[in-house]
Amino acid sequence: GDNFVPYRGTSVYLAYNSETVENPPKTAEELYQWIEEHPGRFTYNDPSTGNSGFSFVANTIYNQLPEEAATSSDEKWKTEHTEEWDNAFTLLEELHPYLYQTAGKVQYPMKNAGSLELLANKEVDMTPAFVNMVLSQKAMGTLPEEIKLTQLEEPFLGGLAGFMIPSIGKIKKQHCL
């Protein structure tokens, strides 16, 4: 179908422990520097298991490209800007050894909740996270009060969820939203 009904939109912010991080990064460059200066204290979830991890990776890539690339479908961003792509993946590789580790190896938590669990247990001090997850978990008491949110000057990609009803559905009235 051609119809999309949004039911939830949320943003990814930087969630951090205010007891251990007095001055959270304000820019992506400051974040990358913080990660290197605080080995093992930052994580993002496996991007294939949660969008907050995907958001960190995608933003790291887009931050190396011209601003227009983030909203353009022009093939030139794939073919004419290979140096910027290479720089982005090099940056991710450079950050890799400074991320959260367990058993002596970098470990990417599973799902958005996995990153927040590490933050709640004080195994990391900072992670990208969906605002609605942080706020609801703080309200339920599963995230401590010292967990705060901040947004970088280069905002993280968010997440929009919605419903689509295919036009081949059995109940024709429902696909006419």
Named regions from a protein language model:
Residues 1-114:
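Extracytoplasmic ligand-binding site segments that recognize negatively charged/polar headgroups
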Residues 111-127:
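Short helices/loops that flank or line small-molecule/ion binding pockets
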Residues 5-9, 35-37, 120-121, 141-143, ...:
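Extracellular/periplasmic catalytic domains that process cell-envelope and extracellular macromolecules
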Residues 126-145:
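A ligand-binding cleft/hinge motif common to bilobed small-molecule-binding domains
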Residues 10, 92-95, 143-167:
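Periplasmic-binding protein-like
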Residues 27, 170-177:
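Short amphipathic alpha-helical coupling segments at ligand-binding clamshell hinges
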Residues 13-20, 61-62, 159-173:
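A bilobed periplasmic-binding-protein/Venus flytrap-type ligand-binding module shared by bacterial periplasmic
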Residues 99-102, 123, 134-137, 149-150:
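N-terminal secretory/targeting leader peptides
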